[in-house]
């Protein structure tokens, strides 16, 4: 049984901060927000570790969108909020467009 504090994985991002992904948060993402992401933990881990691009949210300067190409005109996006030096995975989804925002990093 997964406890609320069980860590699925933790990654270091190219921006120099870590993102621990907790089992309970991942469950919320795949149950309520984006069920299509079920079973794609490794893909999101890769997106956080090796994104093609990272953009900063226009609405919240502490939110970063990590993008990795999945196929032409299709990206995986991991949305991370950085608080007190560490990242928190807000959500993850597949998209056909990269959001407008300040580019922070490109591979």
Language-model-detected regions and their locations in the chain:
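Ribonuclease/tRNase effector modules and their secretory precursors
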Residues: 1-107
